[in-house]
């Protein structure tokens, strides 16, 4: 099955049969501390750690159900949440022994911080 789906991920995953996908790539909003609301007004959450984890956890649970035993999941985050998500969510649901790689996507564009070093990378966890 070669398909790309762009919609409410949790609703979509809940309606999928179990064990059908070879690859899942999740790129959730980053935890910025702001109130986030989707374009359609669905799925509002406070972009803070506790809300972020409780918002992300069900997606990861459902992703495990629909992923084949031999499948791979990629979770794309930034430096604010990658380690929390790895230990508190991904290792718990997928198992630490299934961790494959921590991919660092480095780039050279973006703003320059006045009070700190600017982040010039994103993090992708692979299980």
Regions found by a protein language model. Give the residues of each.
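Core catalytic lobe of class I
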Residues: 1-127
């Amino acid at each position: 099955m070669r398909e790309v789906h762009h919609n409410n991920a949790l609703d979509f995953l809940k309606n999928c049969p179990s064990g059908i996908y070879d690859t899942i790539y999740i790129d959730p909003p980053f935890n910025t501390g702001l109130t986030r609301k989707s374009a359609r007004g669905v799925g509002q959450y406070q972009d803070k750690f506790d809300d972020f984890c409780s918002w992300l956890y069900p997606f990861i649970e459902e992703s495990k159900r629909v992923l084949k035993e031999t499948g791979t999941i990629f979770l794309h985050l930034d430096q604010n949440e990658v380690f929390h998500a790895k230990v508190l969510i991904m290792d718990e649901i997928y198992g630490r022994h299934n961790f494959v790689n921590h991919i660092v996507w480095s780039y050279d564009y973006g703003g320059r911080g006045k009070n700190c070093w600017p982040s010039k990378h994103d993090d992708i966890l692979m299980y």
